[in-house]
Amino acid sequence: MMMNHSIVFIDEGHSFIFSREFADVIEETDNYYVLISRRALTCLPYSIHEIYGIRTSGRYHFPEKIYHEFYPIYKEDEWQNIESPVLFITEDSKSGYQFVKECCDEKAICMSAEGNSDIYELLKKQSNGQKTVVLADGAVFGAYIGKILVYAKVKKNLMLYLPESFEWIILKSGVLSSKKLEDILAHPEMYIDSKEYFSWERFYTDYLEKMTANDKIRKYKK
């Protein structure tokens, strides 16, 4: 019997949580899932802001966000008066990549990793002194953030920009405006149905496309 409208807890002792089949099944449900694991769940699109560690205080155990705040992992003076081109790596090859590429000047290079899972491998191929900025959708980057942060602390030449999604940036920019949009951006959890949207990134994309559908100039298509 399929559960509905439930909060489901599963720990890593059940290895199926790492499978594509599990991801496909839960995508069709309206439940919320709390998955307890020390390994990344690469088959699932989860947010960098929804990763928790279990903190112990005496007899009590409680969850605590791990990536609730990003501290600078570079020195400001290292990013001033840059002579060599800065490399921008985007997760996607569509609208986000196209936007960044258009914004790049002669001192910048833009590359697409063609997916979240390939960002780390692309970073390893760059020269040690290459100043690099990684742009990815924070709403679905949870499985990869740990490895990237470890790499960043070692290399000291990497900046991370991880907004919810590229579509979220557009909605947040002020190009479009409405009272409902303001409320959605302030309280997304009140509007995003987990059965209809497997990730918040999908919701923002769908909402932006619907909001601009009848606008010949600003019509958005991912």
Name each model-derived stretch.
Residues 5-10, 14-23, 27, 41, ...:
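Acidic, divalent-metal-binding catalytic cores of TOPRIM
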Residues 1-3:
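Short glycine-rich substrate-engagement loop in P-loop NTPases that contacts/grips substrate
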Residues 45-53:
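Conserved catalytic segment of ABC-fold P-loop ATPases
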Residues 32-45:
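Conserved helicase ATPase motor motifs in RecA-like P-loop NTPase domains
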